Amino acid sequence: MIGYMAKLKVLEVIRQGQIGGGESHLLDLIYFLDREKVEPVCLSFTDGEMIRRLTRMGIVCHIINSQKPFDIKVQGQIIKLIQNEHIQLVNAHGSRAASNILYPVRKLHIPLIYTVHGWSFHDDQSYIVRKLRGWSEKIICSSANQIICVSESNKVTGIKVFGLKNAIVIENGVNLDKFNPDGSFKYLRSEFGFSESDFIVGFIARCTKQKNPLVFLAALEKSHHVHPSIKGLFVGEGDMDGEVDAYIQQHQMKGYLFRSSFRTDVPDLLHCIDVYCLPSLWEGLSIALLEAMAMRKAIIATPTDGTKEVIEHQKNGLVVQFDDVPALAKSIGVFYENKVMKEECANQAWKFVTERFNAKRVAESVSTIYSEIMNNGG
C-alpha cells in the first residue's frame, strides 16, 4: 500500500457525472472536506454537470466511460489512475461505482469505503433480479473496509436481506447556507407562466422509473381538474423523458404544467413552489427531499426507507402509499384547501432539517472515518 502522508489523497468514485442525489452528496462532501487534511480526486463513469462544478472548485476529475457494473474492460484504466494519482483510500458512492472499483483496490491493497445511497435491490423487481442484486451487494460490502449508510433504514434492510456487517450510519446533509428560505432568490413564476395566486406543486428530480414521474403527472391532472389554480413544475431529465413528454401531450397538460430539463438553480426553483412532491418507489435518504424541507416547503412523499425517517404524516408532511394516484391527488388538495396546515408542515420540516441534517457535519464525520481507517493500517 502507498505510504501514509500528512494530507490524505482520496479517490471519490461515482457512477455518473449528471447530478442526482448521490452526486449532490458528493459535491457537498468535497466542498466541506478540510483540504488541509484531505485531497479529494473524483472518478466518474460519465461526464456531466457535477464534473464541471468540481472542476471549477479546483478538484482533479477523471472520466472513464462505462455504463455497466463489474465492467472488466475498465479495470486496467482504473488501476493506472490509482497509481498515477497516488491514491491512498477509495470511497465508492453507489453500487455500480463500487462494483467497478473492487478488483483495482484489491490488487493494489487500497482500503475501500462503500457509501450506500440506497440499495440496488428493491420490491418492484422480480424475485431473481432482487436475489442477484442482493448477492452483488453482499460481495461489495464484504470487500469494503467500512460501509456508510445514509439512513438507518438502509442499514436495517441490508442486515435483513444479506446479513450486512461493519456498517455505520452517517445521514445525508444539506448545505444550509445555499438552501436558506430567508435568502434572496430569483423570481421564476413569470418565467414559467405562473401567477402569484397559482398553487404550484413541484417535481424536481431525475426523470426515471425510481422517481415515478407518471404518478406525479396523473395526480397533478386530477388535482387541477378539481382546483384549476393548482399547477405543476416538472424539472428533470432521464430515461423516461419520452414517456413523460407523451403523457403531457396526450393529456393536454401544457396549459398548467411547465416542463424543463435539468437546471442548476435549485434553490430558486424551490422558492417558487408551494409543495414539493416525491412519489419515489425507493430512496436511500433523498437529498432533494432534505433540500426542499430546508427551503421550508410542504412535502408529499412515499414511505421509502429514508423518507420514513424524516417525514411524519400530518406533522411535517404528508405520506402516501406507492403508486396511489388518488391518494396523492387528495393530498395535494388537502394542502391547497388548508393553508394553515401546509404552513405548519413546512415550518416543522424546516425545523427538523436545520437541527439534524447539516452537510458540514456529514463531511466532518466522513473525514473522521477516513482518518480512522488509515490510522488502523487500512
Residue ranges, per PLM feature:
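A short, well-ordered alpha-helix in the C-terminal region of glycosyltransferases
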Residues: 190, 327, 334, 341-355, ...
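Short hydrophobic beta-strand element within catalytic cores of glycosyltransferases
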Residues: 43-44, 298-301, 311
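Short His-centered aromatic/hydrophobic patch
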Residues: 92-98, 116
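Conserved acidic donor-binding segment of nucleotide-sugar-dependent glycosyltransferases
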Residues: 313-314, 318-325, 334-339
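A conserved mid-protein helix/loop that constitutes part of the nucleotide-sugar donor-binding site
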Residues: 20-28, 199, 203-225, 239-245, ...
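Helix-loop-beta element that forms the nucleotide-linked donor phosphate-binding surface
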Residues: 55-59, 155-176, 181
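Nucleotide-activated donor-binding/catalytic signature segment of Leloir-type glycosyltransferases, i.e.
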Residues: 245-261
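Aromatic "clamp/platform" in nucleotide-sugar-dependent glycosyltransferases that forms part
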Residues: 262, 281
